[in-house]
Amino acid sequence: MTQPTVVAVVDIGSNSIKALVAERGGPGGIAPLLNEAVDSRISAGIGGTPPRLTEDGMECGAAAIRKLLDAIAPFAPEKTALVATSAVRDAANGTEFARRIQAVTGHELRILSGGEEANLIGRGLTSDPRLADLQSFYVFDLGGGSLECLAFRSRRIEQAISLPLGCVRLTERCVPDPAAPFTDRSRADVYACCRAAFGSSGFRFSLPAGSGAVFTGGTVTTVRQIVAERSGVSLPETSPVISVARLRALLDEIAVLPLPSRRQIAGLPAARADVLPAALTTALAVAEAGAFSSFRHSLHNLRFGVAAELLEV
């Protein structure tokens, strides 16, 4: 069978839905042709018992998927994959959403297990030429529903787990009023959730001393965009290394602000302003758990891993 040369991926995350069209080639084996995202929080309600996708969330998600498929169409990909992560995986009505998406798009929606998600994120990371110098390192991918944690030794995955520490999930669980300033109590509750999850997960920080940590997902992308706006440069011109001190300073800055004021911060998407405090707190809890002073940021995560799978690279 002839290997495909152009593929497309729609990554249905908890806080946004992203599309990637890619072809074989480039330094990491994958050359992106289109990279587009739509803020569409399908995960509202996943903090409930049991977690459920709301009707509004499913409708908004379906509209975003149709919009991205329209953007993909001119590239005529030979294979197109739709994948869903924590919000759909954990929702009691996740399979109903998958059936709805297949009915309106004609594409089957693949609901990834936590292990599949973590491993595909790892596969995507290794396609990033900017990380080619890393041999043994950790990867943390924070979404709206979950936190994927990986450890690479000699560029091979040694550990991969999924923890229920997504920023939408923790905001619903730990922040009584997301429109109000982020209180010390909420910060402590998010930290406690993270410590408990790491403590019971069996994830080991056992790589050689000095092994780096990569952070992916919208949280650090947002931090870099805020830095870019304040520096008068584009996001790619900012450093991909984000210090823990910078994360802590940004959290201290936004924690005292009510939601309307947070939404005025240049570079901070309005749709993420309510969950960013919990997201930054989670990143700081990861740094504490692993004794990291900084993270390297990469945009090559899940959708790049799925593209690598489709392209067979």
Q: What function would you assign to each model-found segment?
A:
Residues S16-K18, S146, V220:
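Structural motif
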Residues T2-A31:
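N-terminal basic/disordered segments at the start of proteins
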Residues P4-V7, V21, S43-D70, P74, ...:
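Helical "lid/coupling" subdomains associated with nucleotide-phosphate turnover
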Residues G28-I42:
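N-terminal glycine-rich anion-binding loops that anchor highly charged ligand groups
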Residues Y138-S146:
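A generic, well-ordered mixed alpha/beta core segment in the N-terminal half of proteins
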